[in-house]
Amino acid sequence: MKLTIPYYLHKAGAGFPSPATDYIEEDIDLNMHLIKNVPATFIIRVQGKSMVDVGINDGDLLVVDKSLKPKNFSTVIANVHDELVVKTLVQERNKKFLTSGSKDFSNRILINEEEDVFIWGVVTYVIHSTY
């Protein structure tokens, strides 16, 4: 489904606004910008506050791509004992862990097949309201 909304080509500065930028340059399709691999992409809503230190709030929408290979410190959706969670991936000494994204790394979940923990996708965008 194509959904276009007005897009201003002028960048939003942090200073004083220019009165010459009060017009729309073109329309933009958010799907084209947020979704790179349609068959492998899904959106999921966040429930909980464990990721607020990395800018992910309760109720946010996450755009997730299952085709991407996660990197160290990627934000991921993981399956932990048949429950989907959003966590930060940390790789150390040939081991991979999931953390809450806070500065406290003491609460780690080891990723391995015996524990029934695996990464389901990489978070590519976080959508949240600022109002």
Residue spans for each PLM region:
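Short, hydrophobic/aromatic-rich segments at coil-to-beta transitions
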Residues: T41, K71-V76
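Short coil-to-beta-strand transition motifs
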Residues: D58, N79-V85, V117-F118
